[in-house]
């Protein structure tokens, strides 16, 4: 005989035939009875009624659990439980009974029980209660429409617990504030679709384990600090911490990009040296120095932001976060001296101050740090000398002989040379490269090698 426990041990899969009780294939008489419609009232034959309900109700829920879904519709269940071309005629009655017992809940009713104002209604994530269902209720007809979306209450709670554990075991849990988009990506394998993900968040919100806020067009989620704690409302400190986290990511990406640009400028200067193009090499070195100064300026801001976040991550209570954040914002102002905002006496003023500093960061990232970049010609010459020395260990010509390599090495210029000496050494360097680059006195113009 089939039981929910036995069905739970069956192998998983998308084919319901592998998940159904033994009598599904073995007992034609019983299956014919189970596929027949319920009597209009249980009082007519309570034994038959209870037998059918005891078969279908647990099967509907266990099937949904195995499929990993929390939302179900009558039409989907009818398709899933087809047998030899027939559909169960009593499934609508089963769903009505589960609704009456509170094991199922209409999706629209569930949403009405929780503050769902943050959900993007405009993009069609959820639909309002169908008009057909509303009219049916008014007329006293309690049949479940085939397209009506129902929520399995216990399965939703299980899914919410799964998502909460997933968050707790991820790097996102370093601080309770997280972007909704990041959380959605984390839960992609657990929640099969966007509707399920939003329902899970609403359930966690109902349990007071999360709260959701829209900030500058982007939704952020705040988690409770412990599995048994209640989440506190999103406040200005939470918003400020979230902005700091976004600034850290932005600055880190920009520093990485500028580091790659610096290496590219250095390589261009090295190639120009090998090609005998001193002015081009100097221009590349100047670009490299500009980039390095930008990196240095951004690193200072990044270090400050990371220091604030480190103190916040180490905080265990909202008051400690508050204190760490207040202290951190003051330090951030000192590190960004161009910010001209009067000293704040309240947290709101400090939040505004942080926004001003972030504007400065954005301007820095957009336009670069160019003020005060006076290049020392002697320093550039020194770096050019170093690049010339580097070329001795990385000759480009594949046609060099051992003797040419020796000549190349012996022609390395000494540090701190004058422009005239540098020109002479560059001339020697060009000749040592197998004559690929002629001297300025050569009567014939040759093509430069392709690098």
UniProtKB/Swiss-Prot annotation:
Family from the record: Belongs to the SNF7 family.
Record protein name field: Charged multivesicular body protein 7
Pfam families with a match to the protein in the record: Snf7, WHD_CHMP7
Modified positions (Phosphoserine) in chain numbering: 232, 411, 432, 442
Organism, as annotated: Mus musculus (Mouse)
Function statement: ESCRT-III-like protein required to recruit the ESCRT-III complex to the nuclear envelope (NE) during late anaphase. Together with SPAST, the ESCRT-III complex promotes NE sealing and mitotic spindle disassembly during late anaphase. Recruited to the reforming NE during anaphase by LEMD2. Plays a role in the endosomal sorting pathway.
Keywords, ordered alphabetically: Coiled coil, Cytoplasm, Nucleus, Phosphoprotein, Protein transport, Transport
One BP annotation, GO: vesicle fusion with vacuole
Compartments it resides in: Cytoplasm; Nucleus envelope
PANTHER family: CHARGED MULTIVESICULAR BODY PROTEIN, CHARGED MULTIVESICULAR BODY PROTEIN 7
Modified residues (Phosphothreonine): 409
Gene3D superfamilies cross-referenced by the UniProt entry: 6.10.140.1230
